A protein has these predicted regions:
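Short, structured segments at the rim of ligand-binding sites
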Residues: 1-169
Length: 169
């Protein structure tokens, strides 16, 4: 029982009861393995301990990469990523609930030649850096000219001549 007196709060001694906590793996980090699977001609990658019952919003990456040619097979032990057929010609997605996945998705789409329009990206301009500008600045060096607005980023699928020896910063 807690006791208060003027500007003092007294809390009686108690016993510490340690408990085990299971910290689930990071789905944001898993997004890069999805990207590798999407870019590879063939892929089968196992990521242990990832669950489709995750509390993390970025677990949506499994569904977001399906149209990019990566299927997710869940088991008790984790998830197996497999290369599958890409079936879309334009990728449109609202990423307002998972804006941190935009960088991985944008680069993947460019490298596989898939035009896209991602919306819900307004928070990316106020992260540790302006991530929208960073994507534009680095991908133009590889020949991908991205078009941005306050809330979206898109690429029409057209490439320009990249720098002869681009320096990615």
């Amino acid at each position: 029982e807690t006791h208060r007196s003027n500007n003092t709060i007294r809390i009686p001694a108690g016993r510490y009861c340690p408990k085990q906590f299971r910290i689930e793996p990071d789905w944001s980090a898993a997004s890069y393995w999805y990207e590798i699977a999407a870019l590879a001609p063939e892929a089968e990658i196992f990521l242990p301990n990832l669950s489709n019952k995750s509390l993390q919003g970025d677990a949506r990456i499994a569904a977001l990469f399906e149209p990019l040619g990566v299927s997710s097979l869940f088991s008790q032990e984790g998830i197996k990523l497999r290369k599958s057929d890409k079936t879309i010609s334009l990728y449109e997605q609202d990423l307002s609930e998972q804006p941190d996945l935009a960088q991985t998705l944008v680069v993947t789409c460019c490298l596989i030649g898939l035009p896209f329009k991602f919306t819900g990206l307004q928070t990316l301009k106020i992260k540790e850096t302006d991530r929208i500008s960073a994507l534009q600045n680095e991908l133009i060096k590889l020949g991908y000219k991205l078009i941005s607005s306050d809330k979206s980023l898109e690429w029409d699928g057209e490439s320009i001549t990249p720098k002869v020896a681009p320096v990615i910063e």
